[in-house]
Amino acid sequence: MAASFLPSILVPLVGLIFPAIAMTSLFIYIEKQEVN
């Protein structure tokens, strides 16, 4: 029972966390470029 619910929880979680990490790393990269 629990295993069938895991994908429906993990997919949105990964879908929200991965873009958040990507945007954060991109923001840090841009900030470093402006400093240099």
Curated annotation (Swiss-Prot):
Record flagged with keyword Membrane: yes
Main localization is plastid
Cell location:
Plastid, Chloroplast thylakoid membrane
Topology in the lipid bilayer: Single-pass membrane protein
So what does this one do? May help in the organization of the PsaL subunit.
Task: Tell me the GO BP annotations in alphabetical order.
Answer: photosynthesis
What gene codes for this chain? psaI
Q: What is this protein called?
A: Photosystem I reaction center subunit VIII
The signal peptide annotation in the UniProt record is: none
Q: Which chain regions cross the lipid bilayer?
A: 9-29
Its domain of life reads Eukaryota
Return the similarity comment: Belongs to the PsaI family.
Q: Which GO terms describe its cellular component?
A: chloroplast thylakoid membrane; photosystem I
Which keywords are on file for this protein?
A: Chloroplast, Membrane, Photosynthesis, Photosystem I, Plastid, Thylakoid, Transmembrane, Transmembrane helix
Does Transmembrane count among this protein's keywords? yes
Species for this entry: Tupiella akineta
